[in-house]
A protein has these predicted regions:
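Short cysteine-rich clusters marking metal-coordination/redox-active sites
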Residues: 3-6, 31-34
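Short linker/helix segments within small regulatory modules
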Residues: 16-26
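Cys/His-rich microdomains that often coordinate metals
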Residues: 10-11, 38
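A generic structural signal for short, solvent-exposed coil/turn residues
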Residues: 3-5, 23, 42-44
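Charged, amphipathic alpha-helical regulatory modules used
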Residues: 43-148
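Polar/charged side chains located within well-ordered beta-strands of beta-rich proteins
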Residues: 11, 27-29
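Short metal-binding segments enriched for Cys and/or His
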Residues: 32-48
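Short, Gly/Pro- and small/polar-rich lid/capping loops
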Residues: 7, 15
Length: 148
């Protein structure tokens, strides 16, 4: 790891932990040249996951799109920015597990199901908004079934 202060290439880790909420590792490092300390957070690279669309075409998975879709349905909340970030992180952890067993691919349908599952437990209003906005061919009967 390169020191962000002096750009020296040798640093040592003197404290390391798995974070409770994130799928990441927190590390406290010290530069061997200048002696300054800094913190890093290491997580898996999401660009290795591919999303299979409805037309069977694969495109890179985008955390930004996931977060924006959650933000757009939770704008009634005072903490919608922070909530969208943490929900996206929770959903992403589940998507990693899906992708691991399927050649690093996830379907659009599985992403939508994970988002709906998370929103259903977190915020009913956001769940209904997401369901009506992103579910194709949603009718009144199906909506009632989802709300039970």
């Amino acid at each position: 790891m390169v020191c962000p202060f002096c750009l020296h290439k040798k640093t040592s880790v003197y404290n390391s932990r798995k974070t409770a909420k994130l799928n990441a590792t927190w590390r406290r490092r010290r530069c061997e040249a200048c002696g300054r300390e800094f913190t890093t957070r290491e997580s898996a690279d999401t660009e290795s996951i591919l999303r299979v669309g409805t037309t069977k075409r694969t495109v890179p998975y985008s955390r930004a799109k996931l977060t924006i879709s959650i933000l757009s349905v939770s704008d009634h909340r005072a903490d919608h920015g922070e909530a969208a970030y943490w929900l996206a992180d929770t959903i992403e952890q589940k998507l990693y597990r899906h992708a691991a067993g399927a050649n690093n691919t996830v379907t659009k349908h599985s992403i939508m199901n994970e988002v709906l599952e998370a929103l259903k437990r977190f915020d009913t209003a956001a769940y209904v908004k997401y369901l009506t906005r992103y579910s194709p061919n949603l009718d009144a009967r199906t909506l009632k079934k989802h709300l039970k």
